[in-house]
Amino acid sequence: MEPDLNEEESERIRTSRNRRSLEHRRNSLLPFQWKATNNSRWMAQVVASEFSLVAFLLLLVMVFSKKWLYPSKSRFHQRYPQNVTKRVYTSIHSMSTGLLYICVSKSCPSSDNGEDNFKMWTIHPVFGVAKISFTLAIGLGFVLTTWLHLPYLPCLQRMPFFGLIGIILSFCEVTLIFLTLLLFPVNLWIYELRKNISVPIGWSYFIGWLVLILYFTCGILCYLNHKNYWSLIMSSTTINTACSSLGPESLVSPSQTPSSQENSQESPKDDQKPSSPDKVVSPPQPDTTG
């Protein structure tokens, strides 16, 4: 009976160890998943807020830069009178200073007074719409940057609908910037076709595409945080790691353990059956004595 008891005890010890290991793995995976999910959400929030800050600073660079066009590199494909050429240069210079540039010095060209600004709206209506969209983009960019930096304050870390509002602001900002970047070259191409000239676009315009990419990335990160994609990704990875880390012994269900115990108990009985024929009494031998 001693070997039978030893086998039963060893089987019970194995099952208890497997159960303890399963419970330990489940309990250890939950805090890790929670920490990883929260860290991913917080890192995405930090990246989105810093991207919005960089994009807003680049918008300010676009506002104060004067390199939207290169008037010195413009080429006339036909000759104009001197007064017409001067007027064309004035228009090109006003477009090269940007969409929100306001000159207050005395060295500014004569097109900066109110009458000539009205003429600019009548001659370049697309340029005027681009000014409006760029002005709205500046204001909305400031609001978005401020909104994405609010979670740094401890009292505002759990605001309702924070991710949803961030998504709406980001994609509205992307729409306004894309409209500005689309209307500015369209206005220039119309003017080039009308005056039969060619003017190269400056580096200030191409900064706008970098701003567009940054704000689009902010919108994607806000969308991922709002839809809890990080928790879904971490839950799927933890399930895969848990299934791969479990051994074949831990996959045996508890209902199968009694049958294994019964088989272990029956095996010694089967070993004891062949010992019974040794105890059979031999028949009496015939007496050979006289």
From Swiss-Prot:
<keyword id="KW-0812">Transmembrane</keyword>
<dbReference type="GO" id="GO:0016020">
    <property type="term" value="C:membrane"/>
</dbReference>
<dbReference type="InterPro" id="IPR050579">
    <property type="entry name" value="PMP-22/EMP/MP20-like"/>
</dbReference>
<feature type="compositionally biased region" description="Polar residues">
    <location>
        <begin position="252"/>
        <end position="266"/>
    </location>
</feature>
<keyword id="KW-1133">Transmembrane helix</keyword>
<dbReference type="GO" id="GO:0001520">
    <property type="term" value="C:outer dense fiber"/>
</dbReference>
<dbReference type="GO" id="GO:0030154">
    <property type="term" value="P:cell differentiation"/>
</dbReference>
<comment type="function">
    <text>Component of the outer dense fibers (ODF) of spermatozoa which could be involved in sperm tail structure, sperm movement and general organization of cellular cytoskeleton.</text>
</comment>
<protein>
    <recommendedName>
        <fullName>Outer dense fiber protein 4</fullName>
    </recommendedName>
</protein>
<keyword id="KW-0217">Developmental protein</keyword>
<dbReference type="GO" id="GO:0031514">
    <property type="term" value="C:motile cilium"/>
</dbReference>
<feature type="transmembrane region" description="Helical">
    <location>
        <begin position="164"/>
        <end position="184"/>
    </location>
</feature>
<feature type="transmembrane region" description="Helical">
    <location>
        <begin position="201"/>
        <end position="221"/>
    </location>
</feature>
<dbReference type="GO" id="GO:0007283">
    <property type="term" value="P:spermatogenesis"/>
</dbReference>
<keyword id="KW-0597">Phosphoprotein</keyword>
<feature type="region of interest" description="Disordered">
    <location>
        <begin position="247"/>
        <end position="290"/>
    </location>
</feature>
<keyword id="KW-0744">Spermatogenesis</keyword>
<keyword id="KW-0472">Membrane</keyword>
<feature type="modified residue" description="Phosphoserine">
    <location>
        <position position="28"/>
    </location>
</feature>
<keyword id="KW-0221">Differentiation</keyword>
<feature type="transmembrane region" description="Helical">
    <location>
        <begin position="125"/>
        <end position="145"/>
    </location>
</feature>
<feature type="transmembrane region" description="Helical">
    <location>
        <begin position="44"/>
        <end position="64"/>
    </location>
</feature>
